[in-house]
Amino acid sequence: MFSLLLVAVLAQGPLTPPGPPTSPAPDAGVADAVVPPLPVASLPPATHDLFRRIQGRVSQVRIIERRSGTKSSIGSAFFVSEKGHALTNYHVVSDVVLHPEDYTAELDRGDATVPVRLLAVDVASDLAIIQVEAPVADFFRLEDREPPQGTRLFAMGNPRDLGTTIVEGTYNGLVRDALYERVHFSGAINPGMSGGPTLSGEGNVVGVNVATMGNQVGFLVPVTKARQLLDRTLALPAPPDAAALRKSVGEQLMANQQRITDRLMATELPKQGLGDYRVPGRWSPFLKCWGDTPHDPETPYTVTSYQCSSEEDIFLSSSHRTGVVTYLHQHVTSQKLGAMRFSALYSTLFSQDPDPVPATREDVTNFRCKSEFVDVKGLTVRAAICLRAYRRFPGLYDLVLRAATLNASTHGVDTSLTLGGFSADNARKLARRYLEGLSWTK
């Protein structure tokens, strides 16, 4: 990178040695023009002054693997109380929550490394609060409300273990129709900056760095979520142990799936036309929907797809995501294949596994499935419903529903629904409502 910068600098230099500067001869009787200095009030606030004032409030979080005694991952955190409370992301400290026997956390204060205690998490917002033992004199104030759109902001953190940095960007409001509240920040948030603060020009916290899509598209946890978690933590009668922390994660996941279920069940399921069928459309504004029909003249059949999914999820661990709703419809038709060959094609399509919610065997059990033929308002449908349980969080499941219409010999709709992190009752309830959205228009 440094060589590229050097090349860029050299490319801007002159091609020939510069001669003495020249200037046009002044007109007789005309005084030299004097350019007035720019008023100080019109200059932007100096980023280096802000950085110098507050850099001691931001620290690097190190997750230490106990057996090796070395760091396995890093993030950022910032102090928010004189009692040593600091905010960071849940995903930064998730290993400590899920595997406290294998991992611990510490803060690099620059002149010393100090152990921290994990006090509270908000898994849906991706927040956590840690605490150092000694009190701190210098800490951030959390803003009471979101800033106006277009406000100039400053993100801080420790990108790629390069030391504390400050990055300028712009506040662009809450992400519209998001399942989990996020702020759109136009600025660079790089790996290692997760859990760091994003600040107003006065140095107050307006959000917590959480994710990036690259190309100056970053995301923050709203400051209101951070304040709510801090208030709950300060009200704790005693620090929780590891079992209580994990239990709180399960309770939060259970509350989150209930919120999503209530929201979907309270909404009329819209219908989307797909060939001669009507299928579930965009069930809620937090779902993004897309459609496509590949065109290959050599293929003797046509597949038109329509897919909806929640673009956000909940990070549980590096191997496990949850809090997901996604579904896919495929309308298959052929004028070239006979009934027998189309049936074989259709069966192959039905037997393909949809992409499940990311998880490993340590996270979830194997799927257990039940297959049957059902009548949906006169439309015969072959359906298979599969559930797998969460090992660490009893009562939570992933569901996969597969269904295919069977009313025609050379066309049909194959559909799949995937739900991540729901109770068994709520998952089945949503699957039934989903199946009721299938119909034939002829």
Question: Residues of each region from the PLM?
Answer:
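N-terminal activation segment of mature serine protease catalytic domains
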Residues: P20-S76, A238-P239, A243-H295
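C-terminal subregion of chymotrypsin/trypsin-like serine protease catalytic domains
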Residues: F51, G201-T267, R428
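Catalytic-histidine neighborhood of serine endopeptidases
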Residues: I74, S81-A124
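Catalytic nucleophile loop of clan PA
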Residues: F78-F79, A188-V208
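Flexible, gly/ser-rich surface segments that form the specificity/activation loops bordering the active-site cleft
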Residues: V92-V97, D138-V183, N190-M193, V210-F219
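Surface-exposed amphipathic alpha-helical segments
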Residues: R227, P237, R282, F286-L287, ...
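Non-catalytic interaction/regulatory modules that flank or connect domains
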Residues: N256-R368
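Signature of long, low-cysteine stretches enriched in small and polar/charged residues
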Residues: A344-T405
